[in-house]
Curated annotation (Swiss-Prot):
Gene3D superfamilies: DNA ligase/mRNA capping enzyme (3.30.470.30). It comes from African swine fever virus (isolate Tick/South Africa/Pretoriuskop Pr4/1996) (ASFV). It is found in: Virion. A divalent metal cation 1 binds at residue 203. Very low-fidelity DNA ligase that seals nicks in double-stranded DNA during DNA repair. Together with the viral repair DNA polymerase X, fills the single nucleotide gaps generated by the AP endonuclease. It is not essential for viral replication and recombination. Displays a very low adenylation activity towards DNA with 3'-dideoxy- or 3'-amino-terminated nicks compared to regular nick DNA. This is DNA ligase. The lineage of its organism: Viruses, Varidnaviria, Bamfordvirae, Nucleocytoviricota, Pokkesviricetes. Residues 1-120 are annotated as: NTD.
Length: 419
């Protein structure tokens, strides 16, 4: 859960990123909000388990630090959180979880107030998809049905209004789009009728145009004013726990405020009762020339993609691609259960390399293979072989297959027999 929040831990204290501004005298000022957990007058390490289970005799404390360059640090009084909220309910929070939610709310509120001077100008990274071609059963276990939307193969974009009334349109990686005046002009008109604090999350797209062309237009300072902005979600920085179905209702209300827009559109929602209905819609969308479908858990909160976090409340459905690539090396995973498990390294014709996860090997087999496969055995039996790889898409920047999984070798090879 810690990776849901921006910032880092140091000496058992979690600090959100500093919000910077400038004093009247031109000096740099920094405001930081922090959370710590105290048990028997001792600050203890913050763990992910604390977000689901309370720690006996522990309380959470929120405090802020403010300092001006060449000045002293001022520390606020502690705000103590001694119990969670909504106890006994499905959305109950622990002491620590509630403290982080309160701190994040204050952080976002302060960031918005200082956005003119803040380094990222109030940018919040958009929510990212965790599941690919899998719809979790939990999506259908709630009282309401999940919704399905068309998946466009465009460029992710988030829009918000700045303190001076200007429109900020930025990418998944928090890079500002400098052009797109046709879209910004309509957004400015729309924000005259809606809550100025709302963020609009969507995709820059023009139907049947290739992604490379769309990306080129999106990143140009002077574009051809052909791209459209398809909005599929909205959120408020201080209400990220708002469920998806409520956000969709509010998004519909937003678009009712001004219905004469040309370049901004609300994405259509389809309610489904089971996975088969979702798959039928995916097939329909593909026939229409779209990339596939997005499935949303209507009870899910908006979870920003801080530290590349991917939300378990979103699923993407699209056709798998496959191709043969030359195997040139092997390595292991870097963290968690993938550490010590073999990964294949393939090479593109342009000599760029990418890592591929074996699809049909168990973790036990992958551990054994990495331990016992020597460079000499690899060179003798596997180097230069063609490996069939399934992947979601090619990276528009590098051409490397994304979410690559090795199906098998073109010629029959049992890699476990090699060792």
């Amino acid at each position: 859960m810690l990776n849901h929040f921006p910032g880092h831990c140091s000496n058992n204290i979690f600090c959100f990123p500093p919000i910077e501004s400038e004093t009247k005298s031109g000096k740099k000022a920094s405001w930081i909000i922090c959370v710590q957990v105290v048990q028997h007058n001792t600050i203890i390490p913050i763990t992910d388990e604390m977000f689901s289970t309370d720690v006996k005799d522990a309380v959470a404390e929120i405090f802020t630090k403010f300092f001006v360059e060449e000045g002293t640090v001022r520390i606020s009084k502690m705000t103590r959180i001694t119990e969670g909220k909504n106890l006994g309910k499905k959305n109950a929070t622990t002491v620590v979880h509630q403290a982080f939610k309160d701190a994040l709310s204050k952080y976002n509120r302060h960031a918005r107030q200082k956005r003119g001077a803040h380094t990222n100008r109030g940018m919040i990274p958009p929510m990212l998809v965790k599941y690919f071609n899998i719809i979790p059963k939990t999506f259908f276990e709630e009282e309401t049905d999940p919704i399905v939307q068309r998946k466009r193969n465009g460029v992710r974009a988030v829009a918000c209004q700045q303190g001076d009334g200007s429109i900020l349109l930025y990418s998944r990686t928090e890079k500002e789009f400098l052009g797109l005046d046709n879209i910004k002009k309509e957004l400015k008109q729309l924000y005259l009728f809606i809550d100025v604090r709302v963020y609009l999350d969507g995709e820059l797209y023009l139907h049947r145009k290739p992604l490379q062309w769309i990306a080129g237009q999106a990143n140009a300072k002077t574009d051809s004013s052909e791209l459209h902005f398809y909005v599929f979600d909205c959120f408020w920085s201080d209400q990220l726990q708002m469920p998806s179905n409520k956000r969709q209702q509010l998004l519909t209300n937003i678009f009712k405020q001004k219905e004469d827009l040309t370049f901004i559109h609300q994405v259509e929602n389809f309610s489904v009762k089971n996975e088969d209905e979702a798959l039928r819609l995916k097939a329909q969308f593909i026939k229409e020339g779209y990339e596939g479908a997005i499935v949303r858990n209507v009870n899910g909160p908006y979870e920003p993609g801080y530290n590349n976090y991917h939300s378990a409340h979103l699923a993407k459905l699209k056709p798998l691609l496959d191709a043969e690539f030359i195997l040139v090396d092997y390595t292991q995973g870097k963290k968690g259960k993938d550490l010590g498990a073999i990964l294949w390294v393939c090479e593109l014709p342009n000599k760029k390399r990418f890592v591929v996860t074996p699809k049909h090997l168990t973790y036990a087999d992958r551990y054994a293979l990495f331990q016992k496969l020597t460079p000499a055995l690899f060179k003798k039996h596997l180097y230069g072989k063609e490996l069939t790889v399934e992947y979601a898409e090619l990276s528009p920047k590098t051409g490397i297959p994304l979410q690559a999984r090795a199906v098998g070798f073109r010629e029959p090879i049992n890699v476990l027999e090699i060792i």
